[in-house]
From Swiss-Prot:
Residues 528-548 have a biased composition (Polar residues). Interacts via its C-terminal region with the TAX1BP3 PDZ domain. This interaction facilitates Rho-mediated activation of the c-Fos serum response element (SRE). Interacts with SEPT9. Specifically binds to GTP-bound RHOA, RHOB and RHOC and inhibits their GTPase activity. GO terms for cellular component: actomyosin contractile ring. It comes from Rattus norvegicus. This is Rhotekin. InterPro entries: AHD (IPR012966), Cytokinesis/Rho-signaling (IPR051364), HR1_rho-bd (IPR011072), PH_domain (IPR001849). Mediates Rho signaling to activate NF-kappa-B and may confer increased resistance to apoptosis to cells in gastric tumorigenesis. May play a novel role in the organization of septin structures.
Length: 548
């Protein structure tokens, strides 16, 4: 059965790739290939996980990849249908109609996500019962775009679930639907004993005794074959932990507000579910939207503006239409440098625009009148351009702005602030390997040399040179009986016999340095062998006179 499912899955992936190639959409094809590779890596990681937390992260990645692949499949299907309908529905005799005007796209950002919990008083206040933990995360989908939050561990000590991520969706229309899905899984192993290997079952039965061990062994064997047991929990699902959909909701343009707001959740879990959480049934978040017409200029050019009440021919300015304002600058460089405009003409949903021509002004014959009502008064500003094409471009930009304002509604009243999402925290670095001594910087103190001398004197009284008859069986020459300084071994030469000397870690020879990454103490001052207590003449003579 597993082989059949794997074959069908491979065929589906091949079909998706072929569909993407037929549409010649390199961007969508690149995204799809990336998610397929991520899915394969998540499957391999899940099979190699040994810790419960690692398996939860791998299962979360696999769930997100599957959701994105399904979303891209739906988008590919829609584009394929549109391509087929476009080829079959068009006739050579049909006249080419201009495309319908559509509202601009925008960015949607959701942040400050909070989901309150409703614990029982015996669990939260009296702290009674078993302490269970759950792993939860949010899956956010807007069109074909899917994002996820970090995995959060929840127990009864928390009053709400807090997600610190800011999810930004680009290329969103005013009719967007942002779906939020809350998934959860129990952190504790479910049915760990039921899925235990036979080796563990044998050890368990032998430790409990003959009669009790046989009953436990029979229970383990029956649970492994049938999937249930009268005394043990059911076996977990094959392939790792399983996330359950706990709640979901859908947010639209009506939920956009430049502030904190509460929304209802649709609960889909029950208390018998192992991943059940006592959700309050609502969530709090900040949902904002930025139409492109509010953040990017839609038209610009040279204008001659005659403000209301002016009797002169007007002022020559550089006009920039951005958002609901027509900014007028002295020069185009002032607009690029961000300087304050000379004056601003307001444009809102009640603004009236009228085009005309002036015969007495041959250089600026085309006019564009913008009228706004303030109370009972009506203020009209007249714009003059030099060509009909310039007049047409300004009229197109204003018509598009009116359409955007009618579709995006209150999002065009003022520019809502979108904070840049902070990067996710990288995994904690592993601790440095090595002893604590190698991580410490030891200062050169005089006490270190004194301690080294004491240790050397103690070890020197215990050391004995090798006997002379040992030279007959080894290649080492016998020790000369002369007590000259050359016959006394130094501490840098290893002795061929006896227990090796133990020196202080502070006195490390220069040719045995610990490397540049380890801090060691400087060498103690050199002293004579006699003062350090290595050997004495009395000790040597006593050794020569002692029997073998």
């Amino acid at each position: 059965m597993q082989d059949r499912l794997r074959i069908l899955e491979d065929l589906n992936m091949l079909y998706i790739r072929q569909m993407a190639l037929s549409l010649e959409d390199t961007e969508l094809q690149r995204k799809l290939d990336h998610e397929i590779r991520m899915r394969e890596g998540a499957c391999k990681l899940l099979a190699a996980c040994s810790q419960r937390e690692q398996a939860l992260e791998a299962t979360k990645s696999l769930l997100v990849c599957n959701s994105r692949i399904l979303s891209y499949m739906g988008e590919l299907q829609r584009r394929k249908e549109a391509q087929v309908l476009g080829k079959t529905g068009r006739r050579p005799s049909d006249s080419v109609q201009p495309p319908e005007r559509s509202p601009c796209r925008g960015r949607v950002c959701i942040s400050d996500l909070r989901i309150p919990l409703m614990w029982k008083d015996t669990e939260y206040f009296k702290n009674k019962g078993d302490l269970h933990r759950w792993a939860v995360f949010l899956l956010l989908q807007l069109g074909e775009q899917i994002q996820d939050t970090e995995m959060v561990l929840v127990d009864r000590t928390l009053t709400d679930i807090s997600f610190q991520n800011n999810a930004i969706f680009a290329e969103a229309g005013p009719d967007f639907e942002l779906r939020l899905e809350l998934y959860g899984a129990c952190v504790e192993e479910e049915g760990a004993l039921a899925g235990a290997p036979k080796r563990l079952a044998t050890k368990l039965s032998s430790s409990l005794g003959r009669s009790s061990g046989k009953r436990v062994r029979a229970s383990l064997d029956s649970a492994g074959g049938s999937g249930n047991s009268p005394i043990l929990l059911p076996t977990p699902a094959v392939g790792g932990p399983r996330y359950h959909l706990l709640a979901h909701t859908t947010l639209t343009l009506a939920a956009v507000q430049d502030g904190f707001r509460t929304h209802d959740l649709t609960l889909t879990s029950h208390e018998e579910n192992p991943a059940w959480l006592p959700l309050y049934g609502s969530m709090c978040c900040r949902l904002v939207a930025q139409p492109l017409c509010m953040t990017q200029p839609t038209a610009s050019g040279t204008l001659r503006v005659q403000q209301a009440g002016e009797l002169q021919s007007g002022t020559l300015v550089h006009g920039v239409l951005k958002g609901t304002n027509l900014f007028c600058y002295w020069r185009s460089e002032d607009a690029d440098s961000g300087q304050e405009p000379l004056f601003t003409i307001l444009i809102n949903k009640e603004t009236r625009v009228r085009a005309g021509e002036l015969e007495q002004a041959p250089e600026w014959p085309f006019t564009l009148s913008i009228s706004n009502r303030y109370g009972d008064d009506e203020v009209t500003n007249t714009l003059q351009v030099q060509s009909r094409d310039a007049l047409q471009s300004w009229m197109e930009a204003l018509w598009q702005l009116f359409l955007d304002m009618s579709q995006w509604k209150h999002c065009c009243d003022e520019v809502m602030k979108i904070e840049t999402p902070a990067p996710r925290k990288p995994p904690q670095a592993l601790a440095k390997q090595g002893s604590l001594y190698h991580e410490m910087a030891i200062e050169p103190l005089e006490d270190i040399a004194a301690v080294t001398d004491i240790l050397a004197q103690r070890e020197g009284t215990r050391l004995e040179p090798p006997p002379p008859w040992l030279a007959m069986f080894t290649d080492q020459p016998a020790l000369r009986s002369s007590c000259s300084p050359a016959s006394v071994p130094t501490w840098t030469q290893p002795l061929p016999w006896g227990r090796p000397r133990t020196f202080s870690l502070d006195a490390v020879p220069a040719d045995h340095s610990l490397g540049p990454s380890r801090s060691v103490a400087p060498l103690p001052p050199q002293r004579s062998p006699q003062s350090r207590g290595f050997y004495s003449k009395s000790q040597l003579s006593t050794w020569l006179q002692s029997p073998v």
